[in-house]
Amino acid sequence: MKLLLHDLSASDAGQYLSISDKQSFQIVGPAEKSPVKCVGCFGCWIKTPGECVLKDGFNHMGEYLGNCEAFTIITQSRYGEFSCFIKNILDRSISTVHPYFVKRQGEIHHKLRYQNHPELQVICYSSDLSEEEKNTFENRVKATAVNLGCSTHSVTFINGLDQSILL
């Protein structure tokens, strides 16, 4: 399975997102309501390992990430960071790791819960990022890839939503 996490509105997704094989994708994007913010309760570690205890339709991200071979994020960036929606969903994905620590790539990180290591591809559609903001964003993606145990990562910058995004 491939996982797509995006922050596009329904109309923008319909207009700019072109997916050749929708059946192979689990698609997570903004819904009718906003996702509940992570409250730091660690219920996804203790009460329902691998699944967020906040049942709002976005609580299965840990399972999706644990079973995907490729993880694509489409996001707008402000100041070199993920959009608020994407950051919120990634925060809610902490269930992909265990609460204890191990050394990975010479750094201390949480032990991975799942054995697969998806490829991470991030497409950033902001049109006014400075070079410093782009560097910050690339570093954020690299850190996210390490935290999620991704095998590879890449970042593509496109100039706003003036072209189709092909997957």
Predicted regions and their residues:
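N-terminal beta1-alpha1-beta2 submodule of the flavodoxin-like/Rossmannoid cofactor-binding fold
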Residues: 1-98, 146, 154, 163-167
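Alpha-helical scaffolding within the catalytic cores
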Residues: 105-109
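Short histidine/acidic/glycine/proline-rich micro-motifs that form metal-
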Residues: 77-79, 126-131
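Glycine-rich phosphate/pyrophosphate-binding loop and the adjoining helix
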Residues: 128-167
